[in-house]
Amino acid sequence: MAIIFATSSFGQVKSIDERIGEAMNGSNWAELRSLYMSDGENLQTPFLKPLSKFFISQFYNEPDSAIKYGKEILEKYQDELNSSVPSIMYFMSEDYAILGHYDKASALLHSLNEAYRKGGQTANPVFEAYEDIYSKLSKCGTFSVERPNNNVSVPLLTHTGNRKNPEMMSVMANINGKEVKCNYDSGAGINIMTTKFAEHIKATVIQTKNIQMLGMSYVDSKGLVVVDSLKLGDLVYRNVPFFVVDMRTDNPLANKKLEELGYECVIGNQTMMPLGEICFDFDRMQLVIPASYTPTPTYAPNFYRSPQRLFHLSLTDGRSGRKIDAIVDTGASGTILTNRYYKKNENCFTGRTATDSLRTAGVGGVNVVKTIPVSWTFTLAGEQYTETNIPVVTSSEQNEEYDCRIGLPTLMAHRKFIINFKNMWMRFED
């Protein structure tokens, strides 16, 4: 979904309106926030102020504010937004859903889909699917989290027991009264489980219109499960939605590995964000949910949640000196520099041939890419770190919208890793 805002330049120096318009057109949300915070008072185009506030609220975890500014935009500036109105309404429906107002989320998308039909157009299948999903969720009870006043600690497990090569990180959970192992995955924007897992916990699969989810490739959902309770230590979630998917690939070896890993249930970042802050204490192998927030550092915020529901962390690349986007993925077995990074810095790899192959398996299939091993330095939260051997992907069909994927080995090389969702910042602690 694109937000279209035309810009034109009449001189050498671009106005703040033009720069903000370009940030929106390029989906550069961190740049948009920086521009607006430093120079937003000088905007001349009336609708750019509420539109900027809408996107900043949307991607920096302020759903209440996003709805407020979204309403203002739809009431006053529909003509100016034109073809971008559906995107605004879709994002607002997601905000309503985050707040547990599934009925409002469904109603908003219903009005959008009806407008398409009345205009003789075909409604967007994603909008239709989520209208159906939110409608079904509105009949299943409100999502909530019950937590004690003290810190909560949940043991972390890895498949290998080796911090340098953990392969997968899991937690033991109690779902609908059954003790089960679940992958704890910050790179998953939604919770998912297999049909087999749903049968194991005796959950009813609700039939919904399918959505496509991106893993190794796109895969269709096969319905929805709403679990009555999900317990992590002393935390209790109520009415938790999980999408049902087929984890199998067309590769027998990959399927065998996924079965060995017990890859059947994924707790995604939609269940992490309501906690406000989480700390991965890798020395003690504990997931800690603190009773009070860590004081906000001066560099906050340094990440946002993208339209694809990924955490985009701002790093300074040691090779180029530029800011780059990295996703933080506790479901990833390794760290990579993506093909997008390679294309931006191709001149740095002149004369080097991609001789290594990287094979990864996950939801939707198997992906094999050619890579070049490099040493890489980056700066996060004012501290510099070095990866001595990291693959740079020289070709890819996935068209990633980020430059780096930070996986488990990089994260677990440190004592702790903190993610604060209230003020949207991350950092290592050593």
Language-model-derived ranges and their functions:
Residues G11-D430:
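Pepsin/retropepsin-fold aspartyl endopeptidases
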Residues M1-A6:
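Bacterial N-terminal signal peptides
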